[in-house]
Amino acid sequence: MASPAAGLTAPVESVMTSRVVMVLEEIPMAEVRAIVSRYDYNGFPVVSREGRLVGVVTKGDLLRVLKAGLGDPDVWLQPVARWMAHGVLALRPRDSIETAVSLMVDSGLRSLPVIEDDGKVVGIVSRNDLMGAVEGGIGP
């Protein structure tokens, strides 16, 4: 079996999830709440109609909306673009798993979107994906 270090040189595309649940930037937070309930992921890439990454929305963002909604229930009608994180970190498919690990450790994020050069989301990689790669000794 290959050493855990061997898995660090493999490309992110070898461990990423390709079937990504994405959120359109204009949908209301009430719909995001339903999506989060259905899929139970911590974060979701937010995309434009063209599929380009514009942000990420997390369960933490939903908690902020919940707090704001205590005094104003109409806050759930606001678009996700109002509440999401902008300028998010992302990986490219050919980035190494080592790069992904470093970004996650340095940023404290649990997952990172994977995008092509044109900004279109092609996958997502989580801490579990990376741990599986290292434990499994995935290598070139």
Place the predicted regions along the sequence by residue:
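Short, basic/aromatic recognition patches
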Residues: 27-34, 101
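A glycine-centered beta-loop-beta connector
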Residues: 36-39, 44-61, 104, 112-129
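A short beta-loop-alpha structural element at the N-terminal edge
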Residues: 23-26, 92
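Tandem CBS (Bateman) regulatory domains
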Residues: 1-19, 58-92, 96-109, 121-140
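Generic detection of intrinsically disordered/low-complexity segments and helix-coil linkers/edges
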Residues: 33-38, 77
